[in-house]
């Protein structure tokens, strides 16, 4: 008898499915499980002596659900007991649910071996094999991620690796997520985490894969091409012009209209860099740092952007696999 898949099990005897169920069914089909298991398995404990370790596949699925749904370690343990749909996705039963310490230790294992970057590479390689490879242009941008500013914690102080910055007329405390995005597919290929007070323009060289012939960015990156780290870089810099450079022109003039047309074309290309930010903040609910320190939070951001690539490409993947279910 053919074994039922997660999706089959959820469809059996059901009249209506929740958004979370449909989301998990889609992710079950598009995540490159074999590639991710191969990445992590060499570092995963074999459970020799004492109680056997939980299956790696189960812990990986639990880890991804934490990122998708924003669960803390204790909340993830409770959710596995309380929310029926999560257990079959992870391949777990009520008789043996990993506790919050086990869930924490799995995340620490990934952090120790710096596997978040590997997760992004595996997912992007998988997408590339399915026709979503990187092209020749990169769009760069950054977004602020708030960190808890309260000192009401066991250390009695704010995270020393987070900093304050001003945007517009408002002050923010936290970090920045800087990303490099393919200009055609909109998929993230590079992620850097810094304190919030680090200038965006200083991180561009870390966001390029090196094969670009075009780099696009908003006006906040004005002058990037003059920085020493880009000396000799043969790319076309499509940086948005500051409004002050053409607002003095008559709006009826041919020059003004030409500049506006050029800026509109630039903006249409740059818009793709906003999609991953929207996915991690609105779809995955990531609006505030969840750990202390840049390293741990950056590792989570890399994982989130890797998962955002799968989310943005899911229709392409499901349609090409002939498995899309509505």
What are these model-predicted stretches?
Residues 1-34, 41-42, 319-326:
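Charged, often Cys/His-bearing segments associated with DNA-binding zinc-finger transcription factors
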Residues 2, 6-7, 74-81, 90, ...:
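Polybasic low-complexity intrinsically disordered regions
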Residues 4-10, 213-214, 219-295, 299:
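Helix-centered, glycine/charged polyanion-binding patches within enzymatic domains
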Residues 32, 51-57, 95, 265, ...:
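Secondary-structure capping and boundary motifs in well-ordered enzyme cores
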Residues 37-57:
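An N-terminal domain-cap segment
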Residues 49-51, 70-72, 110-111:
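N-terminal core-binding DNA-recognition domain of tyrosine recombinases/integrases
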Residues 54-59, 79-82:
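Non-catalytic DNA-binding core/recognition domains of DNA-processing enzymes
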Residues 58-70:
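Alpha-helical support elements that line or immediately flank enzyme active sites
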């Amino acid at each position: 008898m053919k074994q039922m898949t997660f999706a089959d099990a959820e469809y059996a005897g059901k009249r209506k499915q929740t958004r979370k169920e449909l989301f998990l069914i889609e992710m079950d089909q598009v995540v490159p499980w074999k590639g991710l298991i191969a990445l992590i398995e060499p570092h995963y404990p074999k459970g020799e002596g004492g109680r056997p370790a939980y299956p790696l596949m189960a812990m990986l699925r639990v880890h991804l659900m934490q990122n998708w749904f924003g669960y803390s370690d204790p909340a993830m343990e409770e959710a596995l007991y309380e929310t029926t749909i999560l257990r079959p996705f992870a391949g777990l039963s009520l008789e043996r649910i990993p506790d919050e310490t086990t869930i924490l230790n799995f995340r620490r294992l990934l952090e120790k071996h710096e596997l978040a970057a590997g997760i992004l590479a595996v997912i992007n390689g998988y997408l590339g094999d399915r026709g979503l490879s990187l092209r020749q242009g990169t769009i760069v941008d950054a977004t602020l991620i708030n960190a808890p500013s309260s000192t009401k914690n066991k250390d009695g102080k704010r995270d020393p690796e987070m900093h304050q910055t001003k945007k517009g007329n408002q002050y923010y405390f936290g970090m920045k997520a800087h990303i490099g995005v393919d200009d055609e597919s909109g998929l993230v290929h590079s992620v850097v985490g810094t304190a919030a007070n680090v200038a965006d323009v200083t991180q561009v060289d870390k966001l390029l894969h090196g094969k670009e012939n075009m780099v696009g960015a908003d006006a906040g990156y004005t002058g990037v091409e003059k920085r020493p780290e880009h000396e000799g870089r043969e790319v076309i810099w499509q940086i948005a012009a500051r409004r002050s450079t053409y607002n003095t022109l008559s709006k009826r003039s041919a020059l003004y209209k030409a500049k506006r047309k050029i800026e509109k074309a630039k903006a249409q290309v740059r818009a793709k860099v906003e999609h991953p930010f929207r996915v991690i903040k609105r779809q995955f609910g990531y609006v505030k740092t969840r750990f202390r320190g840049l390293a741990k939070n950056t590792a989570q951001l890399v994982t989130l952007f890797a998962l955002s690539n799968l989310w943005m490409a899911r229709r392409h993947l499901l349609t090409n696999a002939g498995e899309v279910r509505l």
